Regions:
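Hydrophobic packing within well-folded, soluble alpha/beta domains
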Residues: 3-5, 60, 86, 138
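Internal alpha-helical scaffold of NAD(P)-dependent oxidoreductase catalytic cores
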Residues: 99-105, 121-159, 169-181
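A structural micro-motif
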Residues: 1, 24, 44, 83-84, ...
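Rossmann-like NAD(P)(H) cofactor-binding subdomain of soluble oxidoreductases
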Residues: 15, 42, 50-55, 59-124, ...
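NAD(P)+-binding Rossmann beta1-loop-alpha1 motif at the extreme N-terminus of oxidoreductases
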Residues: 1-48, 52-55, 119-120
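A general structural signal for well-ordered alpha-helical segments in protein cores
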Residues: 12, 32, 36, 57, ...
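Class I S-adenosyl-L-methionine
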Residues: 20, 37-40, 77, 98, ...
Length: 181
């Protein structure tokens, strides 16, 4: 299965690296030349062309900052038709994603930083028009990255706040316990 990871930052790299390790054929997109070299150095196939990556993919991960989602989806809209798009962009609603890519199969997710070691809690909300088969394919892929849990999208913003902060709070508690003896 071919998977495009649009955005080669920390989260995009973690998604790409872990899926590649699991045997998926990955292409990552990144605009910054120094970051492209870093991603290539760790063995990932990289391009700066989002449309090319989307065209070659069966599934597309959107791993860009929320402010960049609109531009990316407008750019790849035609190449993403009838494909599963998994967005990890915080605070970007399913309705917004569906409006930008109406012919794609959208899943909104929120992983946490434990994604780096494939141990993330991953909340996900599929678009209501997704088939059970599409959801199962996405869950299989998300399972490589951690533990996926389907939630109602109305809870996603709260989960985003908790999921993003929980590892930091646990690290703070662990550090305090270490100093306390």
């Amino acid at each position: 299965m071919n998977i495009a990871v649009i955005g080669g930052g920390v989260i995009g790299e973690a998604v790409a690296r872990n899926l590649a390790k699991a045997g998926y054929n990955i292409i990552v997109t990144e605009k910054r030349s120094e970051r492209i070299r870093e991603l290539e150095r760790i063995g990932l196939r990289v391009t700066s062309n989002n449309r090319l990556a989307a065209r070659q993919a069966d599934i597309i991960f959107i791993c860009v900052k929320p402010k960049d989602v609109k531009g990316v989806l407008e750019e790849i809209r035609e190449d993403a038709e009838n494909k599963i798009i998994i967005s990890v962009a915080a605070a970007v609603s399913l309705s917004f994603l569906r409006k930008l890519a109406p012919k794609s199969k959208i899943i909104r997710t929120m992983p946490n930083l434990a994604l780096i070691v494939s141990e993330s809690f991953i909340a996900y909300s599929p678009s209501p028009d997704l088939s059970q088969e599409d959801v199962e394919v996405a869950v299989k892929i998300l399972s490589v990255l951690g533990k996926p849990y389907m939630i109602d999208e109305s809870h996603m913003d709260a989960i985003t706040a908790l999921s993003g902060c929980a590892p930091a709070y646990l690290a703070l508690i662990a550090e305090a316990l270490t100093y306390a003896g």
